[in-house]
């Protein structure tokens, strides 16, 4: 009888141990959180600039009166400030013949949720998405005129809490951009004077910011 009792206790202990091991494996930890929002593997020819876990390679941009910039749920979250809030790439970045893709989402606010400042040769320009009250898309600046006033300006409705895929392409004589596959910019840059507004100058050479708006960014990748 004692042998049967001992065997029974050993069996119960064995299954209890298995249960505890399984329970431990299910406990959340930082590396297993939010698996559904981790960056996808970059397509051939593309390099991921954001790992979905840290700001490695990035610095929070030194704007005046910014909100916070940090990684939340596998994305870079830019909290609303009293001006621009953003991140700037801190490593080498091409000046010409490259493409950038990313996904951006507006969380709250009424101005641009994604402003990409980028090099074009020795000049710089910014792609503004959702500016001037929310609908304006365009390049700032072209021949001294910002995105609301120059030939690249267009209007597009952006829903809050919705992801938009933004694709920027810079070549020797053209700047192009697409949002969710729809081309919104097709500018022949020959003979054009490209510049940026002074308030986004800290984003140089390559940075992404919002203006008095909370937004989030993910799957930032580069092709050159």
Regions found by a protein language model. Give the residues of each.
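Carbohydrate-interacting regions of secretory-pathway proteins
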Residues: 26-224
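Bacterial N-terminal signal peptides that target proteins for export
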Residues: 2-15
């Amino acid at each position: 009888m004692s042998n049967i009792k001992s065997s029974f206790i050993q069996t119960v202990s064995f299954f209890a141990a298995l249960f505890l091991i399984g329970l431990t494996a299910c406990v959340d930890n930082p590396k297993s959180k939010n698996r559904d929002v981790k960056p996808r593997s970059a397509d051939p020819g593309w390099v991921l600039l954001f790992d979905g876990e840290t700001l490695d390679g990035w610095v929070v941009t030194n704007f005046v009166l910014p909100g916070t910039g940090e990684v939340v749920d596998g994305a870079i979250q830019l909290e609303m400030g009293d001006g621009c809030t953003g991140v700037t790439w801190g490593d080498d970045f091409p000046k010409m013949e490259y493409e950038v893709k990313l996904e951006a989402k507006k969380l709250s606010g009424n101005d641009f949720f994604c402003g990409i400042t980028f090099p074009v040769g020795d000049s710089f320009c910014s792609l503004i998405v959702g500016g001037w009250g929310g609908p304006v898309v365009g390049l700032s600046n072209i021949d001294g005129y910002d995105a609301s006033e120059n030939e690249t300006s267009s209007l597009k409705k952006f829903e809050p809490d919705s992801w938009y895929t933004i694709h920027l392409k810079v070549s020797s004589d053209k700047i192009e951009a697409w949002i969710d596959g729809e081309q919104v910019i097709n500018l022949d840059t020959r003979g054009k004077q490209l510049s940026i507004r002074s308030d986004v100058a800290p984003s140089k050479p390559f940075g992404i910011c919002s203006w008095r708006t909370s937004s989030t960014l993910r799957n930032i990748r580069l092709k050159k």
